[in-house]
From Swiss-Prot:
Origin organism lineage: Eukaryota, Fungi, Dikarya, Ascomycota, Saccharomycotina
Removed propeptide positions: 340-342
UniProt keyword RNA-binding present: no
N-terminal signal peptide: none
Lipidation (S-farnesyl cysteine): 339
Residue(s) carrying Cysteine methyl ester: 339
Designated name of the protein: Peroxisomal membrane protein import receptor PEX19
InterPro entries, alphabetized: Pex19 (IPR006708), Pex19_C_sf (IPR038322)
Amino acid sequence: MNENEYDNFDDLDDLLDEDPTKLDEAEPDDVQAKGSVYNDSENKEKNAESKDSDGVQVANESEEDPELKEMMVDLQNEFANLMKNNGNENNVKTEDFNKLISALEEAAKVPHQQMEQGCSSLKSNSTDKGTVNGSNPGFKNIVSNTLDRLKENGNKVDTSLAEETKESQRSGQNNNIDDILSQLLDQMVASGGKESAENQFDLKDGEMDDAITKILDQMTSKEVLYEPMKEMRSEFGVWFQENGENEEHKEKIGTYKRQFNIVDEIVNIYELKDYDELKHKDRVTELLDELEQLGDSPIRSANSPLKHGNEEEELMKMLEIDGNDPNLGNLDKELTDGCKQQ
């Protein structure tokens, strides 16, 4: 056995003779080091989770902004009110608008990256301009302005619908003579009238005749007279059943029957399948002239062109003017002077 081999055996012998408890002394330091690394990793994970939790909390706050949500609801309601009168053809537009609302809601949310940057400013009660409760003040202004414009357009639509309703009532079968006269006189003034040197409205004889002809043609049209005449014929029938045999009407019963026959003929003309305004106008005009010459009828229909009673007295009552008023005779002169001053 040489010297090197002997030294090796000595080392082995020393190792075997060493106290076994000393072999574990280094282990706590290693475990402590490993535990420190593990704890550091766990702490980092907890810190990351805490940051994520803070971000989610702020994000949730941003998504639950009551003011912005209220604006969105108002915006949808105003759009629904604006579109409700336009029929089913706007269903596609309504869906598109709902998509737009969803897009606006998404745009209002602050991105997650901005949340992480804004957490420190929120915790420190920063007063800098930026995101507050997850919504941008500039974005709120855009939504608010859009809502105001939508309300303004809704008011314009309501006004337009009201005007269209009035216009449809004028153009329908419920036209009254006052509306027809007003429209025709306006047209006459706009197209046929001229101003004289004294700044007074003047019409030539031919122009006046044409204007009167237009008025008469319109007043004798089916559009104006059919419904009143039809109602008058029906009321005549009821009146004859109730009063035809009364002695008090014996003297005028013949006149009333002739009036009934004229009204019945006019209604029958209007109900012809081949009715033509130009073709039957002359006959209707003749019947109306005869009906007027026969005088008052026993029918008190509000739509009847031959209302019973003194129309002059009714007019004075409406105007609250006493027929015996001495100043009434100067009314024409005052009206003439007023027109000249205008």
